[in-house]
Amino acid sequence: MPHDGNERSHRIARLAAVVSGIAGLLLCGIVPLLPVNQTTATIFWPQGSTADGNITQITAPLVSGAPRALDISIPCSAIATLPANGGLVLSTLPAGGVDTGKAGLFVRANQDTVVVAFRDSVAAVAARSTIAAGGCSALHIWADTGGAGADFMGIPGGAGTLPPEKKPQVGGIFTDLKVGAQPGLSARVDIDTRFITTPGALKKAVMLLGVLAVLVAMVGLAALDRLSRGRTLRDWLTRYRPRVRVGFASRLADAAVIATLLLWHVIGATSSDDGYLLTVARVAPKAGYVANYYRYFGTTEAPFDWYTSVLAQLAAVSTAGVWMRLPATLAGIACWLIVSRFVLRRLGPGPGGLASNRVAVFTAGAVFLSAWLPFNNGLRPEPLIALGVLVTWVLVERSIALGRLAPAAVAIIVATLTATLAPQGLIALAPLLTGARAIAQRIRRRRATDGLLAPLAVLAAALSLITVVVFRDQTLATVAESARIKYKVGPTIAWYQDFLRYYFLTVESNVEGSMSRRFAVLVLLFCLFGVLFVLLRRGRVAGLASGPAWRLIGTTAVGLLLLTFTPTKWAVQFGAFAGLAGVLGAVTAFTFARIGLHSRRNLTLYVTALLFVLAWATSGINGWFYVGNYGVPWYDIQPVIASHPVTSMFLTLSILTGLLAAWYHFRMDYAGHTEVKDNRRNRILASTPLLVVAVIMVAGEVGSMAKAAVFRYPLYTTAKANLTALSTGLSSCAMADDVLAEPDPNAGMLQPVPGQAFGPDGPLGGISPVGFKPEGVGEDLKSDPVVSKPGLVNSDASPNKPNAAITDSAGTAGGKGPVGINGSHAALPFGLDPARTPVMGSYGENNLAATATSAWYQLPPRSPDRPLVVVSAAGAIWSYKEDGDFIYGQSLKLQWGVTGPDGRIQPLGQVFPIDIGPQPAWRNLRFPLAWAPPEADVARIVAYDPNLSPEQWFAFTPPRVPVLESLQRLIGSATPVLMDIATAANFPCQRPFSEHLGIAELPQYRILPDHKQTAASSNLWQSSSTGGPFLFTQALLRTSTIATYLRGDWYRDWGSVEQYHRLVPADQAPDAVVEEGVITVPGWGRPGPIRALP
């Protein structure tokens, strides 16, 4: 009877596994094809009227650029009302935007004709005389998936069509027509809202049933596992309860690793994509889906959106960086605990094994930290991928060790969840691939009792469960369209060019190839190939489990192979290997200790290789992303000690030890075997080199950030922002509290001391300027190109050569403006009023030395909110950096003075300006009032330009002492802002402009990073041609730059702030009213491709 009962239980469990597994597979498999509820959005025009009864314009910037469909009808009688010189009949973008003719629909009338053009391609033309004579009834314009066209109805030859790629961008409807709403005058814009979908009742039910079926199937498989071993449930639970004995070494390593991770959480640099992911998460709830905010025409982030959805929930609590980065730090702690508690014990259990070797445990912690800190302290998915890879490996090993298949099913679920974190999450499949043979053998052994169908059905069902996550609110068609656009827009690099990923690590003066990142990858590769060499040569190492060790090597190697199939090749993706690196570090220390004891030559070669790794790593800069560089030593150069490069020191040591190893090698022919005596001292010497090297690197990284945090305080750093957030209950505003802005630069303009004499050029020119004149300003003030290195994240420039790009803050690149107070025609920057701001410059003076000394200007009383004397200037100006290096140019100094009792002014010292550049564009020279003698109450400009070169000139405006206020006070938390990728995470209180129903809210400000980052990344990644926010900001808005400074850090180019102004004011073109609806669409339905062309 017991035997019959066991067989009956086996049959029931097998039947449950088969039926539930197949049901789960089918139910989950059809999820991508099930119908969803799609929100529709349509704009009808005209909307409202002006006070005199005429139609109004409307503003509606579409996130996708082009609409799904467009249909416009304009009575020819309305067109005939335009004046004789013509005008704008209708357009979908303002005429004054950047290259709007190349993107929009424009119907223009001149004296003779009316022309309909889509993206600068003419579709139809009609003579105005024919229209005025009543030769046509209406102009019909349309654009949809079939094409674009126009028809002057009633005029022979007045119709024309264009291909679908001419579908215009829509930012609203704009017109010069002065007519009222009337029959036949209409426009309909169907917005492409294909990604704004929610699951219907059917899809919800199928997903729920599918998940339940898979869970039941896995329970059935677990029951088969139990029954196949002939134990009762109680025996099974007792037998497989984990027994983990933690020694002192493990506890000490735990404390050190976790303490370092927690410290790094506060003081460590963040990743390059923190702002990207934070902004996407913040706008997702209102957008209705996880939309790509900065690129790709607003497509969904699916199938890699579930992690961003989690971030959106965190952002609903607080957007402070110290809060948002909790998942990364918790993942790091979890990774280490898994390594120390499970992985090391699996690789070397028992006395004398790897897990009981103190140095191996310490080495695992040090190598893990050296691989984790440079990559995984941000919102990027690599920390969770590293955790997912380790969990998958542990589950696969548990399945193999215990002969159970249920852990393998769980491993499949974990691996697929990890794979959908990001494309590089594909490496989570590596443990499954390397363990597949052993699992398949287990299935074959149990075939007689379990059959093949039961385990295979459950494993397949576990694999299919990922469709519920990926397609929970999207469909197969929308995810496919999103992928198409991303591959169309790029950047993508072919799999066979994956070597570029490693090349990026070697590029000099590149943050992506910094010292810490080079070391992490070099150590990973060193450990991988080192252990592989030892195992191939020796076969087995005492204390190391051979099977798990080989599968660890296979997991790492296959993971690196799978990484080649990712479309991007950013070096930061190596962070996904941090957990494996730590484990390999322990195995390397353990195995090399054995071969080191065997031979002095081998031990010396081991040390030589590690010294060479250090030499190669320290040939890179100690650079970190953006704000992470603030106050860090050697952030832009190779580390040096006593003026000697550290890389040269390690290379020299490596050469010396290499020569010593060669001597040991040749000495073997004469002295025989050179085995090292097996005592405690030698065992320590043989096992600690990797530990020492990794500790040096970790100490350098943590020490660099700690030094920046301590020695720069109270100046802004990431550490200061995090500590302030913690002390204020996450309510501080990080960089927005420390960036100071000039709300009105004209208000701070200094006034000349009364009673002074000066020439016809006014007080700024002084008594008799030579060579300086109001018109002495060049028209073209574009700065020199910024050359960025290959491999820069969020840059779509060439991946294999340096890239040059030009960018300047709005209004700083020169040009002509209205006539100023002293006759200058220069266009002034930063909101300076030409009616109150004179200009003097030496441009064009190529015959003699130019000189000018301005009149004395009265300084205001000292106050904390007025710390600077500021001079707006252009051209080439001599200045000194904070480290003492000079920037070549001509001399512009500020001279302090003091007014005596008799009213006479006594000159005091002169100072060069702080000039953050770039030359020759307009910028604000800074003279901290802390530099002024305490008695100084006046100041004047002393200008001298003896260089006759056409490039060596400069221009300047009067000094001002502006009242500064924080950016948080100026912008606040309610104003919509475009925060560039690099800056968004540093301004948690500012609100990113929202997207709703496929329409973008127009921002009022833009926060940019430093000049180089803007040129190399922001302006390329966010461009209109790639579907970024410039798609509508450049078409609908004009910009001006606000003068800003980083509190107390006057030498710092922290970035800039631009203010947006609508080309067509909101009272003339209010935001469109959108009619919303809901339709049901099948999972395979595709309303044509989204236009994703330049």
Swiss-Prot record:
Q: Per its UniProt entry, which superkingdom is the organism in?
A: Bacteria
Record keywords, A-Z? Antibiotic resistance, Cell membrane, Cell wall biogenesis/degradation, Glycosyltransferase, Membrane, Transferase, Transmembrane, Transmembrane helix
- GO molecular function, one example? arabinosyltransferase activity
Kindly give any further remark recorded in the entry: This is one of the target of the anti-tuberculosis drug ethambutol [(S,S')-2,2'-(ethylenediimino)di-1-butanol; EMB]. EMB is a first-line drug used to treat tuberculosis. EMB inhibits the transfer of arabinogalactan into the cell wall.
The yes or no answer to whether the keyword Cell membrane is present is: yes
Task: Provide the protein's localization.
Answer: Cell membrane
Question: Of which family is this protein a member?
Answer: Belongs to the emb family.
Q: Which InterPro entries match?
A: Arabino_trans_C, Arabino_trans_C_2, Arabino_trans_central, Arabino_trans_N, EmbABC_dom1
Offer one Pfam family short name for this entry.
Arabino_trans_C
Q: How does it sit in the membrane?
A: Multi-pass membrane protein
Q: How changing D833A affects the protein?
A: Resistance to EMB
Query: What happens on changing A201T?
Result: Resistance to EMB
Outline the inducing conditions.
Answer: Positively regulated by the transcriptional regulatory protein EmbR.
Q: Where are the transmembrane segments?
A: 12-34, 205-224, 247-269, 322-344, 356-375, 408-430, 451-470, 519-536, 543-565, 575-597, 604-626, 641-663, 684-706
Entry function: Arabinosyl transferase responsible for the polymerization of arabinose into the arabinan of arabinogalactan.
| Organism of provenance | Mycobacterium tuberculosis (strain ATCC 25618 / H37Rv)
Q: Which GO terms describe its biological process?
A: Actinobacterium-type cell wall biogenesis; cell wall organization; response to antibiotic
**Name the UniProt record assigns to this protein:** Probable arabinosyltransferase A
Pull one GO CC term from this UniProt entry.
cytosol
Quote the EC number. 2.4.2.-
Top enzyme category: transferase
**Its principal location?**
membrane
